[in-house]
């Protein structure tokens, strides 16, 4: 029974990893796009429009929730959702942990509620380099609700927690964003800031 449970756990973990890994190539694609680098070096309005349209098309083809590019201060210079009323364009996301990691050259990973849209998502961030120097950050926002829906259809009792013990995915949506263990006051404060 224990061995079967471990296999099930491993299967769920691989399913989550597989879902997220479908999007990990996208920051590299942005790094290769000349207009993205040009925009980060000189944020001219006409260039911004070209990059917005490029990101919109890439987002549509990849089926991610949103793709956006930030300068090194955390300001969104271009976004795939530029046409939407709740567009990220111009937003200051410097407070986000995924941005802070990526601008330092680390992979940024974060599950949270969007500060602009109020919509949950998994964020993958990557520093965009030019001649060995980070000139901006690419962010891919991914929806993972399809995974939860598959668990529900299969009548599985499953959930995934982040490093703080917060449930970020669950076959029972009412469990989402609840903690599996008590949070310290410091952790609560850090999470509120993020």
Where are these regions (language model features)?
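Amphipathic coiled-coil signal-relay and dimerization helices
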Residues: 38-39, 74-82, 167-171
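Extracytoplasmic/periplasmic ligand-binding sensor regions of membrane-associated signaling proteins
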Residues: 60-63, 73-150
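N-terminal short leaders/motifs
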Residues: 9-19, 65-83, 182-192
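Juxtamembrane extracytoplasmic/periplasmic/luminal helical "stalk" adjacent to the first N-terminal
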Residues: 1-42, 54, 62-65, 107
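Solvent-exposed, extracytoplasmic
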Residues: 50-61, 92-97, 137-192
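Short, structured helix-loop boundary elements
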Residues: 2, 6, 24, 45-48, ...
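Conserved beta-strand and immediately adjacent loop positions that scaffold enzyme active sites
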Residues: 66, 122-125, 157, 164
């Amino acid at each position: 029974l224990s061995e079967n449970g471990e296999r099930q756990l491993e299967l769920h973990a691989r399913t989550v990893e597989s879902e997220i890994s479908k999007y990990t190539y996208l920051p590299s694609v942005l790094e290769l796009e000349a207009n993205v680098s040009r925009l980060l070096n000189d944020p001219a309005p006409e260039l911004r429009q070209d990059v917005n349209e490029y990101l919109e098309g890439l987002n549509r083809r990849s089926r991610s929730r949103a793709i956006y590019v930030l300068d090194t201060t955390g300001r969104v210079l271009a976004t795939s959702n530029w046409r939407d009323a709740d567009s990220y364009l111009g937003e200051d996301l410097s407070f986000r942990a995924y941005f802070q990691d990526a601008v330092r050259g680390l992979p940024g990973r974060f599950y949270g509620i969007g500060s602009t849209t109020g919509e949950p998502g998994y964020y993958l961030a990557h520093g965009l380099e030019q001649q060995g120097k980070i000139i901006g950050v690419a962010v891919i926002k991914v929806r993972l609700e399809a995974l939860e829906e598959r668990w529900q259809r299969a009548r599985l009792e499953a959930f995934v927690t982040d490093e703080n013990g917060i449930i970020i995915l669950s076959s029972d949506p009412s469990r989402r964003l609840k903690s599996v263990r008590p949070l310290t006051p410091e952790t609560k404060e850090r999470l509120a800031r993020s």
